[in-house]
Regions:
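Hydrophobic alpha-helical transmembrane segments
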Residues: 1-78, 93-102, 107-108, 113-172
Length: 172
């Protein structure tokens, strides 16, 4: 149980911008991270939902609510997922061979496809967040990060690993 709790704090420190007490890496708890990822999603979803309730409580304009709902998940994750989205958009948009796309993923420079993808993503989120600002579906804000992280965990657990992935190594 202690290792699972430590894995949760490790997961939060990696995938969330909320400060946590975990400062050390435990190699043996690495595989438990996949189980903890949906819990971090729940934490982010609750923050997102509470922010939406506060916006409605204070009667903020629909555009401001859209802006808040669009930006909260980025700030809660420390922009980690936006950075990853931009890297993948850049690699896929390059239409290059697999080896070159892997190089693009590792490159720290931002390419044109990354910028275009980022702008479209943020505009899309803003439009949908603004449209849903006074909707009864706001409770889904809790579920969306949980489901996305469940899918991510399942993908890491089931899909073939890249040779450079830490999960490609055999368990000790």
């Amino acid at each position: 149980m202690k290792r699972l709790i430590h894995a949760f704090w490790m997961c939060q420190s990696m995938f969330c911008a909320i400060p946590c007490p975990c400062k050390t890496w435990d190699e043996e708890a690495r595989y438990a991270l996949l189980w903890c990822l949906p819990l971090v999603g729940l934490e982010i979803g609750l923050i997102w939902w509470i922010c939406s309730l506060l916006c409605l409580y204070f009667g903020l304009h629909q555009l401001i609510v859209g802006l808040v709902l669009c930006t909260v998940p980025f700030f809660a994750t420390g922009f980690l997922h936006l950075d990853g989205f931009m890297d993948v958009t850049d690699a896929v948009g390059s239409c290059r061979d697999l080896a070159r796309r892997r190089e693009i993923l590792k490159d720290s420079h931002v390419g044109s496809f990354a910028v275009i993808g980022c702008v479209l993503l943020i505009l899309g989120q803003f439009v949908f967040a603004g449209a849903a600002a006074d909707s009864a579906y706001l409770r889904l804000l809790i579920v969306i990060p949980v489901v996305s992280r469940c899918c991510s965990s399942a993908a890491v657990a089931v899909l073939p690993k890249m040779s450079t992935s830490q999960y490609a190594r055999k368990k000790a």
